[in-house]
Curated annotation (Swiss-Prot):
Pathway: Lipid metabolism; phospholipid metabolism. This is Glycerol-3-phosphate acyltransferase. GO terms for biological process: phospholipid biosynthetic process. The chain crosses the membrane at residues 4-24, 80-100, 117-137, 139-159. The lineage of its organism: Bacteria, Pseudomonadati, Pseudomonadota, Gammaproteobacteria, Vibrionales. Keywords: Cell inner membrane, Cell membrane, Lipid biosynthesis, Lipid metabolism, Membrane, Phospholipid biosynthesis, Phospholipid metabolism, Transferase, Transmembrane, Transmembrane helix. It is a multi-pass membrane protein. Probably interacts with PlsX. The gene is plsY. NCBIfam families: glycerol-3-phosphate 1-O-acyltransferase PlsY. HAMAP family: PlsY. Its EC number is 2.3.1.275. Catalyzes the transfer of an acyl group from acyl-phosphate (acyl-PO(4)) to glycerol-3-phosphate (G3P) to form lysophosphatidic acid (LPA). This enzyme utilizes acyl-phosphate as fatty acyl donor, but not acyl-CoA or acyl-ACP. Belongs to the PlsY family. It catalyses: an acyl phosphate + sn-glycerol 3-phosphate = a 1-acyl-sn-glycero-3-phosphate + phosphate.
């Protein structure tokens, strides 16, 4: 790995470590998403506690955390496999943020943002898959899992040279969802839009 790729990997992790959900909730004077609802600082949980506007802002910011470093690396001529490493670094920053006590989200939106530079057709297929599963079953986590399982196949169909890095990224997302998988099997996973909240954790 050359110096440019190492630098972009570090930048990607640090950018990913900026928790959009926590900062936006602070600005809007909403509860800390790490202590209410699903305790996950992501767009779905912010939707539960703050509504569509706040959730959309979180979604956009989380996607940009993946898009900016990967797109920058692409234009700097970094090879596809190393772009995958940069994407993983951005997602790891989102999942284990340096600036927020390593309490982060699941990385789905950041991963989508990282994949977006590959092409709008691939991005559209991924988003359509997520929306279809989410509408049919009302589980954000299930939609994410189905989408990441299909994403490498979509990538192979469109730009096969990026299949390996996308597959690496998707494996990380699946591992991060291990608790959601357990709750889906036990029937305890909250559905999209549910308003039932837990009391904030004591600081």
């Amino acid at each position: 790995m050359d110096a440019m790729a190492v630098t972009m990997t570090i930048i990607a992790y640090l950018l990913g470590s900026i928790s959009s959900a926590v900062l936006i909730c602070r600005v809007l004077r909403l509860p800390d998403p790490r202590g209410v609802g699903s305790n996950n600082p992501g767009a779905t949980n912010v939707l539960r506690i703050g509504g569509k506007g706040a959730a959309a802002a979180v979604l956009l910011c989380d996607m940009l955390k993946g898009t900016i470093p990967v797109w920058s690396g692409y234009y700097l001529g970094i090879e596809p496999v190393l772009l995958g490493v940069i994407a993983i670094a951005a997602c790891l920053g989102h999942m284990y943020p340096l600036f927020f006590h390593f309490q982060g989200g699941k990385g789905v939106a950041t991963a989508l943002g990282a994949i977006a530079p590959i092409g709008l057709d691939l991005t559209g297929m991924i988003m359509a898959t997520w929306l279809l599963v989410a509408i049919l079953f009302r589980y954000s986590s299930l939609a994410a899992l189905v989408t990441v399982l299909l994403a490498p196949m979509y990538t192979w169909m469109i730009k096969p040279q990026y299949t390996l890095p996308v597959g690496m990224l998707c494996c990380l997302i699946v591992l991060r969802h291990h608790q959601n998988i357990r709750r889906l099997f036990t029937g305890e996973e909250p559905k999209i839009g549910e308003k039932k909240l837990q009391m904030p954790k004591s600081q």
